[in-house]
């Protein structure tokens, strides 16, 4: 899926979620997200957990241990993952997620706006990892 934004009346691609094409086999909504930016960088690493209970028990265990919470808990619009973002001791952003969309090649690709990238079905709006 491409993320489109308006730049002085012209639509430009801000980024793209990419997934492994396995034909009719269902795969995660995205494996990588590329963004058109002025400099090279890596935004965050994401780790899938088994279910809602694992996500929330990890959330409270990390809080209790004094780790720095960054963003969440919420549900992304694109990919529909339930998410929770944290900072590691070096300030790097880590995401725990569960229950994301599974798609096959028949789904194709969509163009979506920045509001879908930054928005949530529920939970905080904004940019994770800040």
Language-model features: locations:
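Intrinsic, low-complexity N-terminal interaction/targeting segments
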Residues: 22-34, 74
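An amphipathic, aromatic/His-enriched active-site/gating alpha helix that lines ligand/cofactor pockets
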Residues: 106-108
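Core segments of cupin and vicinal oxygen chelate
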Residues: 1-27
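Conserved acetyl-CoA binding element of GNAT-fold acetyltransferases
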Residues: 16, 43-44
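A short beta-turn/loop motif at secondary-structure boundaries
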Residues: 6-10, 37, 75-79
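Short, conserved beta-strand edge motifs with alternating hydrophobic and charged residues
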Residues: 19, 35, 46-48
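Vicinal oxygen chelate
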Residues: 40, 46-94, 98-104, 117-130
């Amino acid at each position: 899926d491409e993320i489109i934004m308006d730049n002085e009346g012209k639509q430009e691609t801000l980024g793209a979620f990419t997934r492994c094409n396995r034909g009719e086999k269902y795969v995660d909504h995205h494996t990588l997200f590329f963004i058109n930016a002025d400099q090279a960088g890596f935004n965050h690493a994401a780790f899938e957990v088994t279910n809602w209970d694992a996500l929330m028990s990890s959330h409270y265990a990390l809080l209790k241990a004094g780790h720095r919470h960054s963003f969440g808990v919420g549900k992304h619009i694109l990919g529909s993952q339930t998410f929770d973002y944290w900072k590691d001791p070096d300030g790097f952003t880590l995401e725990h997620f569960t229950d994301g969309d599974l798609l096959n090649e028949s789904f194709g690709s969509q163009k979506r706006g920045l509001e879908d990238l930054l928005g949530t079905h529920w939970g905080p709006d904004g940019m994770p990892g800040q």
